[in-house]
C-alpha cells in the first residue's frame, strides 16, 4: 500500500508510555472520524540530548504503521523544516499541523471542532490528547491495539493475578519532575520545584484514595514510581 497516495495523520509520540498510549489512542480515534490513515512518528521526539524517554508502543500489537523517514522531520534540515511549517500553519487553508492548545497553566481540553478543520493530505498531530473523548467510540478497537506482544511475560508477572483479581487502582507518583535528565548544575530552583511537585502529588493522591475507598469495596492500591 503506497502511503504517499493516502490521506495520513502522522502522530508525533513522545514522553513515557502512558503519554504515548493516549497520543496513539486519541489520534487513532480522530483518524477514523476524518477518514485518514494513522502513521506513527516514533523517532523525532526522542532525538534531543535532553530526552530521557524511549518509544514503547512496540510492546503492543498496534496495527498502525511507523511513518517512513520521508514523513519524519529528521536531522538538522528536518528540525528547521518542522519549525518553519508550524510557524506558517495559520496561513494554510488546509492545515499541515494540528497542535493541541494549552492554557497558561499548560492545561489542555477536548477540542469539539477537531473533525471540522480543513486538513492537508498529510497532517502532523502534536499534543498529549489526554481524554478518552477522542477514542470512546472505538473503545473495543483501542483495547485490542493495546494487547501485549509478549502475552506470556505479562501473565507471568507477579502483579498480574493481584491486579486482575481485585478492585485494583494504580497510582503513579512522578518524582524528580524538574530535575530528571538535567545537569546537577541547573541549580536549587529546579530541585525545590520537584520537591513541591511531589508534595502536591501526595496530597492529591491521598484525596484520591479517600474518594475511591468510598466508591469501591475493598480497593487495592498499587503504587508505581
PLM region spans:
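A short beta-strand-loop structural module common to alpha/beta enzyme folds
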Residues: 36-47
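A short, glycine/small-residue-rich beta-strand->loop->alpha-helix junction that serves as a flexible
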Residues: 13-22
